[in-house]
């Protein structure tokens, strides 16, 4: 029996990166793109030489995994409902962040009820530069102890940034959060403690109405030990 798994990708905007990754991995076969019949979806499918579908019910029976690159309520999209419909078809789901807490809780309950797997993908910790920063940061933390963390991010990648910090510290508890200040701009400062390490977090709390992918700030993380500072200036390096 072949170990290669058949995969569909839902969404063609950010989904194009999932589709390219699946198509390049010999462990998977990309069966097609699940979308709304847009020109972009059709063009992506044509470029990759796969099919397109507009309904979950139309998917082939051999599909075992779906990558849902469709947002949730925070973006006015129906990604969680789509993920639940896919699990009801017997398909495991990898869904893109961010989701509201209630959306994620509901999906976990549905996955348990339906006997499926559902994973929330924060994406950034797997990027090569970020993964290397996490690896080096863990080594420093184990040997010297991190004395302080500084992080800055756009609100769109807030959850992913916290996931990077959790991976770096190998946990989050015990944790605490001070009430945020009433800042005079969209830059909001937060003071936290994660895993007994103090953290200063700056979040650009705004979205462009016409393009939620436009960000003037993505991610920066710095850690300080008694021997110096290690910084990640961008998730793409250095």
Each PLM stretch: what is its role?
Residues 1-48:
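N-terminal Rossmann-like dinucleotide-binding module
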Residues 10-13, 34-37, 69-72, 96-98, ...:
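Structural motif
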Residues 22, 42-48, 106-110, 162-168:
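Short, aromatic/basic amphipathic alpha-helical patches
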Residues 23-29, 88-93, 114-117, 144-145:
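Short, surface-exposed connector motifs at secondary-structure boundaries
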Residues 48-110:
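Beta-loop-alpha module in the N-terminal Rossmann-like domain of NAD(P)-dependent dehydrogenases
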Residues 54, 95, 120-122, 179:
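Short loop/edge segments at beta-strand edges and connector loops
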Residues 100-164:
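A contiguous active-site-proximal alpha/beta segment in oxidoreductase catalytic domains
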Residues 159-238:
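Contiguous beta-strand/loop segments that form the cofactor/metal-binding neighborhood of enzyme cores
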